[in-house]
Amino acid sequence: MNLTTNGFQRNLPSSLGNMEMIEFLDISHNSFHGKLPRSFLKGCDSLIVLKLSHKKLSEEVFPEASNFFSILELSMDNNLFTGKIGRGLQSLRSLIMLDISNNNLSGVIPSWFDQLQDLHSLQISNNLLEGEVPISLFNMSSLQLLALSANSLSGDLPQAISGYGALKVLLLRDNNLSGVIPDTLLGKNIIVLDLRNNRLSGNIPEFINTQYIRILLLRGNNLTGSIPRRLCAVRSIHLLDLANNKLNGSIPSCLRNASLGLGRGGYIRRLFIIITFFLWEHLSVHFSNLCSCKMGLLSIMS
């Protein structure tokens, strides 16, 4: 059921919980407000995709367990949710994509996210979260996109034991992260790395295992030393931003005449295009056979 971009107002009706057979529900971009009805969280046990984005929903996010045992995609971004990230999300063991960004969530990032073993995309940017980033997030075998930008996260980036798992996109800009950038962070899978506007120090790590990185954004830190010459060997890079650091030495000759798409408007536009393309190509959940009685033949593009 697609009810997006209408003029619906008031609270979400409790009767939503009576739709036991529904698999797809998108009521984004309306003016619903208030909290999620308990009857809704306890019903709709056939839901596979639920989109509640861009509304005025408030109070806690999933403070208790729900019956959404089959859900693969949950989008609750751009609302007014407050409080801690609810433990009710812990029961969504089939979840592949979770977006709770652009809310007013506070507290720390729960360590139990690593129990969602099928999770490919976790987006919690633009909230009020604090504390350290749990090392368990970086070792998840399936997690490919992790977006924690624009919070108040602090501490060092962990020296992840397994080389940051399957991560391809890591967005940590506008936090209070400190310490050095671990060599293991630039693993063989990373495509986009955004660490802008933190308090990171030390040298830019070597790019020994990096093969596919397209975007490297390190602006606004306290990085020192020279620009690694090994950057010249990273042929895949599209965007490179090292401004507002404390770097010294000479610019490698391979970068002096490089065109990195930093013209007017090109920076943000290209970053958006590449990340959006990544989401569609690697993470999107697509329905096929929409006209058949079984709506929900799902395939994950990889």
Swiss-Prot record:
InterPro entries: Leu-rich_rpt, LRR_dom_sf, RLP_Defense_Trigger. Keywords: Leucine-rich repeat, Receptor, Repeat. It comes from the Eukaryota. It holds the Pfam family LRR_1. LRR repeats lie at residues 1-19, 20-43, 45-70, 72-91, 92-115, 116-140, 142-164, 166-188, 190-211, 213-234, 235-258. The keyword Repeat applies. Belongs to the RLP family. This is Putative receptor-like protein 16. The gene is RLP16.
